[in-house]
């Protein structure tokens, strides 16, 4: 059972209670996170996990402007403040007892930029791979499901969503069928395909 976006409005005790309820029902407790995004888009906001840094210090910039996609700013996967956030979030998830995490909006971590904190990184996919290695370091003992993510590199997760949300319009049906056209071969890349949701 996955606790989606909004889980951070709960206290640690409430998160633990959710996990305990799932276990009592014979279910595995899952949670959600977007490690490479800033939804607040507030450059002056301080990063609580690494005092001394503000969000403007970790954004990916292109032509001097923060990279924005789907309503969120992209952050630099190579910045030490992002690793500090990963460590902090991982520790919370582990203390609460979560065994599964859906990592969403992962494409933000693969966006191109003028530069990265780590000067050895020259492309968006290199930055993404660097960030995924860090995620593996902190979340590697959990079941990882990627969403809105590059197909490759694929070795850091057990599953990937073949597409995003689809609703009741014909364009959504077209979108879902298009996703299926490449979804069939992803079973050879990831252990499991995630179709997101199915209308019954």
What annotation goes with each model-predicted range?
Residues 1-91, 96-120:
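Aromatic-lined carbohydrate-binding/catalytic grooves of carbohydrate-active enzymes
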Residues 109-142:
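Short acidic, glycine/proline-enriched helix-loop-strand junctions
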